[in-house]
């Protein structure tokens, strides 16, 4: 990188393993500045519980970004609303979690930070606090006023984007419209080019129904919706292969000639990716006006404060964000 950049990290649920993982991230030097939006006392306490060194440096947006020395983090303080006890959810801290996300998002929007890396949150406790919260993806979409965002998970070997995200199965067929597919594929194609540096992205597209509809005998969404959209976009120069049956698409015959897979719904594409690379995956939100990556796992409340949480996915998410920053320069 030509000069140091500054990224912002949110540890997520304070009672979970997120704060532990952030402390573990700090045990190595980084070529960028790591600004953590969190309660400083919480991070200091977790470092002590893990027996790891940690010095918190004050965040100053007026000071040029510098590489992060090992054993340190730059702190952008947000105060807990109640004490955080490892492994025990506290509804009073639901607003704290949302406040960290809002401050980090706003910092990306105003140019303070080059990317945002998020730790795992507990959706239930946030909603129990009276805050409507579906997930990070939807939260950042609304706060950034993005027209549309796309959820994509990635490992070193595989990228899977979703046409729909957190919808019940009975609602998915109605949600797969020509307008939706045009938007999702356009965003996926654009961000693969601009954020991943792929000049001509090759995208595999899953069918919605078993056997991709079997010529209309197992559903007509492929014939009525998916195929016409793909034909239109191919005519514009996009390299799209599909719709293909999801039960046979995930094999080298297809994947060796593709840069990403577009699945029609959450549990069509993600089980394969998580089986192939759980703990090494990264969640990326495409379509935002900034770079956002995240771990691919949950809060792991039972591991909080015990030093047993695996930092691998967080390291991968941070490294991918750094690569994406380079690609967009």
From Swiss-Prot:
* Keyword tags: Cobalt, Cytoplasm, Magnesium, Metal-binding, NAD, NADP, Oxidoreductase, Pyridoxine biosynthesis, Zinc
Essential cofactor(s): Zn(2+); Mg(2+); Co(2+)
* Amino-acid positions noted as binding a divalent metal cation in the UniProt annotation, renumbered to this chain: 166, 211, 266
Gene Ontology cellular component terms for the protein in this record: cytoplasm
Q: In which pathway does it act?
A: Cofactor biosynthesis; pyridoxine 5'-phosphate biosynthesis; pyridoxine 5'-phosphate from D-erythrose 4-phosphate: step 4/5
InterPro entries the record matches = PdxA (IPR037510), PdxA_fam (IPR005255)
- Cofactor binding comment, as recorded: Binds 1 divalent metal cation per subunit. Can probably use ions such as Zn(2+), Mg(2+) or Co(2+).
One GO term (biological process):
pyridoxine biosynthetic process
EC code: 1.1.1.262
Q: Which Gene3D superfamilies does this chain map to? A: Isopropylmalate Dehydrogenase (3.40.718.10)
A GO MF annotation of the entry reads: cobalt ion binding
Q: What class of enzyme is it?
A: oxidoreductase
Location of this chain's protein in the cell? Cytoplasm
Major location category of this protein: cytoplasm
**Which residues of this UniProt protein bind substrate?**
136-137, 274, 283, 292
In which domain of life is the source organism classified?
Bacteria
Could you tell me which Pfam families the record lists for this protein?
Answer: PdxA (PF04166)
Instruction: Spell out the reaction equation it catalyses.
Output: 4-(phosphooxy)-L-threonine + NAD(+) = 3-amino-2-oxopropyl phosphate + CO2 + NADH
How this chain assembles, per its entry, is: Homodimer.
Its annotated function is as follows: Catalyzes the NAD(P)-dependent oxidation of 4-(phosphooxy)-L-threonine (HTP) into 2-amino-3-oxo-4-(phosphooxy)butyric acid which spontaneously decarboxylates to form 3-amino-2-oxopropyl phosphate (AHAP).
PANTHER family hit by this protein: 4-HYDROXYTHREONINE-4-PHOSPHATE DEHYDROGENASE (PTHR30004:SF5)
Q: Which family does it belong to?
A: Belongs to the PdxA family.
Q: What else is known?
A: The active site is located at the dimer interface.
Protein name in UniProt? 4-hydroxythreonine-4-phosphate dehydrogenase
What high-level taxonomic lineage is stated for the organism?
A: Bacteria, Pseudomonadati, Pseudomonadota, Gammaproteobacteria, Enterobacterales
């Amino acid at each position: 990188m030509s000069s140091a950049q500054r990224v912002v990290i949110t540890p997520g649920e304070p009672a979970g393993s997120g704060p532990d993982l952030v402390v573990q991230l700090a045990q190595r030097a980084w070529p960028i500045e790591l600004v953590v939006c969190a309660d400083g006392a919480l991070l200091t306490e977790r470092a002590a519980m893990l027996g790891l060194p940690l010095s918190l440096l004050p965040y100053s947006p007026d000071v040029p970004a510098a590489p992060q020395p090992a054993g340190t983090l730059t702190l952008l303080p947000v105060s807990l609303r109640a004490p955080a006890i490892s492994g025990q959810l506290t509804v009073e801290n639901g607003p704290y979690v949302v406040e960290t996300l809002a401050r980090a998002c706003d910092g990306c929007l105003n140019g303070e930070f080059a990317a945002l890396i998020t730790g795992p949150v507990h959706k239930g406790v946030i909603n129990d606090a009276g805050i409507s919260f579906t997930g990070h993806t939807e939260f950042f979409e609304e706060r950034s006023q993005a027209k549309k965002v796309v959820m994509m998970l990635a490992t070193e070997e595989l990228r899977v984007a979703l046409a729909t995200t957190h919808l019940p199965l009975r609602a998915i067929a109605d949600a797969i419209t020509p307008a939706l597919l045009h938007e999702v594929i356009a965003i996926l194609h654009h961000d693969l080019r601009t954020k991943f540096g792929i000049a001509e992205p090759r995208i595999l597209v899953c069918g919605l129904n078993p056997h991709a509809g079997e010529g209309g005998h197992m559903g007509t969404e492929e014939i009525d919706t998916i195929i016409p959209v793909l034909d239109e976009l191919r005519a514009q120069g996009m390299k799209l292969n599909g719709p293909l049956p999801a039960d046979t698409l995930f094999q080298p015959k297809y994947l060796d000639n593709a840069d990403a897979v577009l699945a029609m719904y959450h549990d069509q594409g993600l089980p394969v990716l998580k089986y192939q690379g759980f703990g090494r995956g990264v969640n990326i939100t495409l379509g935002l006006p900034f770079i956002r990556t995240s771990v691919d796992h949950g809060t792991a409340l039972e591991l909080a404060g015990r030093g047993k949480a695996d930092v691998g996915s967080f390291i991968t998410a941070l490294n991918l964000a750094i690569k994406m920053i380079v690609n967009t320069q």
